Regions:
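Short, charged, surface-exposed loops that flank catalytic or proteolytic processing sites
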Residues: 366-378
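Bacterial N-terminal signal peptides
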Residues: 10-21
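Beta-alpha junction/loop-to-helix N-cap segments that form part of ligand/metal-binding clefts
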Residues: 40-47, 71-78, 90-166, 178, ...
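Solvent-exposed, acidic/polar segments of extracytosolic/periplasmic ligand-binding ectodomains
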Residues: 29-53, 57, 384-447
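Periplasmic-binding protein-like
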Residues: 123-136, 156-158, 202-205, 255-265, ...
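Extracytoplasmic ligand/sensor domains, especially the bilobed periplasmic-binding protein
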Residues: 44-45, 114, 129-234, 283-315
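Extracellular/periplasmic periplasmic-binding protein-like sensory domains
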Residues: 272-355, 366-369, 414, 420-446
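Extracytoplasmic "Venus flytrap"
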Residues: 38-83, 107-113, 136-139, 204-212, ...
Length: 447
């Protein structure tokens, strides 16, 4: 078998120290992702991986592994198992005075809050997990967050964006969010469109807290960065919708120049596919609609309607990012089903974002040196880490990450997809232009 250690490192190691772990204007190093420490990933196969059991460091992966949202389970099994395999190949994670192998235990939410509660409780009480990790849907995350607090278990949320998760009503000390929130996304996208001519926007989002928060965040961003913009329509649809025609007909009649949508899989791809079929080829400002099969289905040039904003992109040019992309791409060539198609060959958006966040989490836990949640909390609060595409800072008072956001318009042709549009040059929006606000009712942030 080939060794992947040298694939990315020959070019990148020298550059790592130039990018690396020193903040601008400072000689003080901060912890950083180091590509030279990544294990040989040539034997990694997410379709076949089996984790050790027994005296392990246990992560409860909370995600939909069945039901209409099951694609998300496949996504995040891939990413968490990547991180765990890497660390296990290095000898495990150093905690409590010894190295422990990492075990990923699936917790199927079925995208249902009641099932989520039972599953999270089982993971805490029976499996004795050290960390709960997930999940798609802020309404699902809220349930996990409450269980984590009850059983004093660290909860890592690398994917769900509702600001309400970290407000005075719902915040708890055990929960940490390592991804952008809806306000950060809305501000970054509005900042980007302030430099484009379009002024008429139609908001089309999923009908639950996250979708409404996405709409509010974007409208606040427009008011701040593009005050002459007009929201010509606003619709919210049920999760896992099959027929978007009634909503897209409203968009057609609204005079909109851009569709703004925070929809995640399967709704986002379904919506865009049906919009194209109806002849509605407006720019789609989005977060999660970068699906490779969708881009191939709608055709290369058509995919250039996609404008994506996110906190990770494969097209961000840093030594760390280049290294992990090359290692991932080489490893993917030998993966088995369901990961044996070209959908998985690059660590796009949610893949790169979540492995970046989990490398940070492991780094924090090793620096804490223990599985004691109180010491992990103390280490993570206020922590700074140089990740794959830039600095991550955990705001101490509300456990919300502060980070730059990236925006790109999809291009065809491109490096990432031979048959469809994909990521173009990433425009970095500095965190000062998309700073997550602190909830007014979170008293601990007023001290």
């Amino acid at each position: 078998m080939r060794s992947l250690k040298g694939v990315a490192l020959v070019v990148c190691l020298g550059l790592f120290f130039l990018w690396g772990a020193v903040l601008p204007g400072s000689s003080t190093a901060i912890p950083a992702f180091d590509p030279s420490k990544v294990a040989d990933m040539s034997e990694y196969d997410p379709g076949k991986i089996v984790f050790p059991t027994g005296d392990t460091f246990k992560i409860g992966l909370m995600e939909a592994f069945s039901g209409p949202g099951a694609a998300n389970g496949r996504y995040y099994w891939l990413t968490t198992s990547w991180n765990a395999y890497d660390y296990n190949k290095r000898g495990g994670i150093m905690v409590d005075g010894k190295r422990k192998m990492i075990e990923i235990i699936k917790g199927d939410t079925q995208s249902k809050p009641a099932i989520t509660k039972k599953t999270a409780e089982r993971l805490c009480l029976e499996d004795k997990v050290n960390v709960l990790w997930g999940a798609s849907g802020s309404h699902i995350c809220l349930v996990i967050q409450k269980v984590a607090e009850k059983y004093k278990t660290i909860y890592h949320n690398p994917m769900s964006l509702s600001p309400a998760l970290m407000d005075g009503k719902n915040f708890n000390r055990y929960a940490f969010r390592t991804c952008l929130d809806t306000n950060m996304f809305g501000e970054a996208m509005a900042y980007y469109f302030a430099r484009r001519p379009e002024k008429k926007f139609y908001i089309l989002n999923q009908d639950y807290s996250y979708g409404h928060d996405m709409a509010d965040g974007f409208k606040k961003g427009l008011a701040k960065h593009k005050p002459d913009a007009v929201v010509v329509g606003e619709s919210f649809h049920p999760l896992f919708l099959k027929d978007f025609a009634p909503y897209l007909t409203k968009v057609q009649g609204s005079g909109a120049e851009v569709i703004f949508s925070g929809d995640w899989t399967p709704d986002g791809p379904t919506m865009v596919k049906q919009a194209v079929q109806m002849g509605l080829r407006l720019p789609v400002a989005n977060l999660y609609i970068d699906n490779r099969p969708l881009m191939e289905t709608i055709g290369g040039p058509t995919g250039e309607i996609m404008i994506n904003a996110n906190d990770y992109m494969v097209s961000v040019e840093t030594p760390q990012n280049k290294a992990i992309i090359d290692i991932w791409h080489e490893s993917s060539k030998d993966w088995s089903a369901p990961y044996d198609t070209d959908e998985w060959i690059w660590p796009v958006t949610i893949f790169g974002r979540s492995i970046d966040a989990t490398y940070w989490m492991f780094d924090v836990i090793e620096r804490a040196g223990t599985t004691d949640p109180e010491k992990i909390i103390a280490t993570w609060e206020g922590d700074e880490y140089m990740g794959l595409v830039g600095k991550l800072k955990m705001r101490a008072c509300d456990h919300q990450v502060i980070r730059d956001i990236f925006v790109t318009q999809f291009e065809f042709p491109n490096k990432w997809h031979e048959k469809g549009a994909s990521y173009g040059k990433a425009i970095r929006i500095d965190s000062m232009y998309c700073m997550p606000p602190v909830a007014d009712d979170l008293d601990r942030c007023k001290k």
